[in-house]
Amino acid sequence: MPYPSDRERDRPWVMRTYAGHSSATTSNALYRRNLAKGQTGLSVAFDLPTQTGYDPDHELARGEVGKVGVPISHIGDMRALFDGIPMAQANTSMTINATAMWLLALYASVAAEHGADLAQLSGTTQNDIIKEYLSRGTYAFPPAPSLRLITDVVVYTVKCMPKWNPINICSYHLQEAGATPVQEVAYAMCTAIAVLDSVRDSGQVAATDFAAVVGRMSFFVNAGVRFVEEMCKLRACGQLWEEICRDRYGVTDPKLRRFRYGVQVNSLGLTEPQPENNVQRIVLEMLAVTLSRDARARAVQLPAWNEALGLPRSWDQQWALRMQQVLAYETDLLDYEDLFDGSRVVEARVAEIAAGARAEIDRVQGMGGAIAAVESGYMKAQLVSSLAARRRRIEDGEDVVVGVNRFTETDPSPLQADGAATIETVDPDTEAQVIEAIRAWRAGRDSAAVDQALRE
């Protein structure tokens, strides 16, 4: 039923597109265009050298500069990236992990130059280095020191940037690495426990302020095309997070126990054959995180239809943004309370996922927690096993992927009529230009001041 007169219509979620490539200047122009089209938050993609802490002129950065994200090497790059963008009003998500503390420092410094009050800045640093050992691999330090860095960022933001989300605990990448719904929920919760235990045990936050730390934990989740199961998974996340916050950490304020999450729907499930089918996949996956009022995402970014082919163009990202806007502003979805309350089917699946996740959480905690389970190889082995099983089901035709293992006969797609022009391409001269720029920056900086700062 619609909301009673004393309840407000739900507000639209923050709408983002994951974007950035070539250079800070190029990406700044892209962000401005996206904001002008009605995007309500920014999601910054960094290139691999930036993610792993290499300058663009390092030999290991060769061929990767500006390719899958924007290169940021110093504060001048960050200034260029946010030139003309009102940082005090922006809600910026930065997908950065091993070097999160450094990128956050640059962002905060530039925001201060803009005149922004750091205590009012809104946004997120992903900062989940633990999942890098299980999926992406862009780590720079061993697990335990990485957890210490995460802890320091959490403590700093809670004290100095209280509206900032210091970590996005990522189940997203776990699913793409093979996780079942139970594993995805369990391992994300284990990571959250490891982070919160580390902050508590560090002694840097008073016991009276610890509930505020718990309240700033946020999650970044995945949603695949099995959208009913995915919706149930998110309801299970909410139940388990409530239990952990209340029972393990003694948080009494219900607002600080809310499962706060953003989402990008499943990119790995998008297909290169018949890529036009990705449009309906993306829409169905978006429903998983928006249909249920009690488990609705507060920030959504959708991949473009052609992401399996390469870097999407600005128009492709606009199409993904318009999907969100049509759902939020044209339909009546936000007029209603939760559509699934009382559903026996939903409640049974939620209970099944939650029970399985509780058992797996207990198993990991019995090993010594998330760090121990990463160092022993347990978590990785479980994900590899699940991924292998998933691949077998696809190869055997048990799991149907339209256009890949069934319904493969097709007419030529007009969306691909332009061939290579169907995707964005990075100018091959970009890397040389970025390298030249950082060398000029080094030559022009005050080396004595740099040395003094390093000594201090």
What are these regions (language model features)?
Residues D10, D57-L60, M87-A88, I130-E132, ...:
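Short acidic (Asp/Glu) and glycine-rich catalytic loops that position anionic groups and cofactors
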Residues G20-S22, D47-P49, T99, I130, ...:
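Short, glycine-/Ser/Thr-/acidic-enriched flexible segments
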Residues G38, H74, G115, W241, ...:
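Conserved, mostly hydrophobic/aromatic
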Residues R62-K67, T92, K131-F141, E176-G178, ...:
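Short beta-alpha connecting loops at secondary-structure transitions
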Residues M189-A192, F220-N222, F227-P312, D316-A320:
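Glycine-rich anion/phosphate-binding loop at the beta-strand->alpha-helix junction
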Residues R313-S314, Q318-Q325, Y329-E456:
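Flexible, glycine-rich loop/tail regions that form catalytic "lids" or insertion modules at the edges
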